[in-house]
Amino acid sequence: MAITASMVAELRAKTDAPMMECKKALTEADGNFEKAEEILRVKLGNKAGKAASRVTAEGVIAYHSEGGIGALVEINCETDFVTKNDSFLAFTKAVAEGIVKNNPADVDAIGAMALSLDGFGPTVEDVRKGLIGKIGENMSVRRFKRFAGSKLASYLHGTRIGVVVEFDGDETAAKDVAMHVAAMKPVSLSSADVPADLVAKERSVAAAKAAEDAAKAQAEGKPVQSAEIVAKRIDGGVQKYLKEVSLYNQSFVKNDKQTVEQMLKERATTVKSFTLYVVGEGIEKKADDFAAEVAAQIAAAKAA
């Protein structure tokens, strides 16, 4: 069967796999899209298994608001293929809606919420287990945050980044802040709010760099900076870092001639807090070796 450019484009849109891989998979599958998707899963899984240091995880960020209450949730799965699955997307949407309506105490409590979907139910946990069997991949609700009592502005960058801003003032300005947070990923509102462990880590890095520079200067017979100058360099590096990672001090993405704080003041808006979710942030995805897995299965079958 002749493989057309439109077929390749369609498979790429569904899987996000490289164009050449899509063409090869369609050729091997003789134009059968379902079979081509399975071929891609095997090929890409094998490649991913070789990337032992790869840090990532797949999933979707969903947001729902109703009656002044909002919910941001991250639901994880094993591969990028499933993030485009209609049933999985419907599940994430339903969970976000359920969090708004039911106000669960924690992630475990989400499983007990009422839900019927795709013939599975009557709880979220029942639907989750049913979809695992149907789709063939594990999935889990990783984290969520429910918002109530404040004006809310949100921004979703596809399904991989989600931001919610609690604010007073101009809604358009707050939405601009949400988009800015998604792009610049600050860790706190102000420099004073940056977590102590991050500050300590940055100070340690700056001190190590200063020590390295001193050793290099000494080895080359050049003057070594005094302890006082070194201390000022370290403090300067830390202060620069604090400005770079705090929302108020960052240059506003839509106008780099002013800081976010200046923009907010100009538009009479106050940001109370922001919440940023990035899919897979902080999760190390297991690097599976597909060939080794197959070999293990064959060995197990022979031993049986």
Swiss-Prot record:
Keywords: Cytoplasm, Elongation factor, Protein biosynthesis
CDD domains hit by this protein: UBA_EF-Ts
Gene Ontology molecular function: any one: translation elongation factor activity
Gene Ontology CC: one annotated term: cytoplasm
Localization in the cell: Cytoplasm
Keyword Protein biosynthesis: yes
InterPro entries assigned: EF-Ts_dimer_sf (IPR036402), Transl_elong_EFTs/EF1B (IPR001816), Transl_elong_EFTs/EF1B_dimer (IPR014039), Transl_elong_Ts_CS (IPR018101), UBA-like_sf (IPR009060)
UniProt main location, coarse: cytoplasm
Region of interest (Involved in Mg(2+) ion dislocation from EF-Tu), residue spans: 79-82
Pfam family, one: EF_TS
SUPFAM superfamilies, per database record: Elongation factor Ts (EF-Ts), dimerisation domain, UBA-like
PROSITE patterns documented for this protein: EF_TS_2
Family to which the UniProt record says this protein belongs: Belongs to the EF-Ts family.
Function: Associates with the EF-Tu.GDP complex and induces the exchange of GDP to GTP. It remains bound to the aminoacyl-tRNA.EF-Tu.GTP complex up to the GTP hydrolysis stage on the ribosome.
The protein's name in its UniProt record: Elongation factor Ts
